Regions:
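Short Gly/Pro-enriched loop/turn and capping motifs at secondary-structure junctions
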Residues: 138-140, 153-156
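Extended, aromatic/histidine-rich regions of cofactor-dependent oxidoreductases associated
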Residues: 147-149
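Short loop/turn positions at the edges of beta-strands in beta-sheet-rich folds
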Residues: 79-81, 127, 137
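Electropositive, beta-rich accessory/interaction domains or terminal extensions
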Residues: 1-109, 118, 154-171
């Protein structure tokens, strides 16, 4: 894409898909990760974002048409908030298994997508960051698949706690 007079490679524009999608070790089939230095890789193979945040963002940003995938996520889910999910938790979706690795920390590409000068700061301040998953078991996932906790990392921080710790270090 063209942004501020420069050509920028990005995979942040995502669209919902119908039907099953193959989950590989490094990404979902058909997914593009433009900058492997900061996105993707084994510990950031899949980006998950809670659907519950969308209503809040649509109102706050005055973007009523902001649709699923609007934050560059691969999976938009129900019931997996940063307050309950812990770093290290293992999830099963469809025939694939995942492990929660870290919160998503925003970069300028979120600014490209949302086009609000303070979006990176607001994203962190609200704690509505979503989180990355590594792929523990390759398989297939589809819209409507149940999400099950396979194992909980009771000693690990919640994603919200990890975001708060990061934010307090930056202040």
């Amino acid at each position: 894409v063209e942004w501020r007079g420069k050509r920028v490679r990005t995979g942040i524009w995502k669209e919902p898909v119908a039907g099953p999608v193959r989950v590989g070790r490094l990404n979902l089939e058909g997914d593009g990760q433009a900058d492997s230095r900061v996105h993707g890789g084994a510990s950031k193979a899949v980006y998950l974002y809670p659907s519950e945040h969308y209503e809040l963002w649509r109102a706050e940003l005055d973007m009523p048409d902001l649709g699923w995938g609007g934050f560059g996520e691969n999976l938009t889910t129900v019931g997996l908030s940063e307050e309950i999910v812990r770093i290290g938790d293992r999830l099963r979706i469809g025939t694939a298994a995942f492990q929660v690795t870290r919160p998503r920390l925003p970069c300028y590409k979120l600014l490209m997508r949302i086009d609000r000068p303070d979006i990176e700061r607001r994203f962190l301040q609200t704690g509505r960051t979503g989180f990355y998953l590594s792929v523990v078991l390759e398989g297939h996932i589809a819209v409507g698949d149940a999400i099950e906790f396979e194992a909980s990392s009771e000693k690990g921080p919640t994603v919200a706690e990890a975001v708060a710790a990061r934010s307090s270090r930056e202040e």
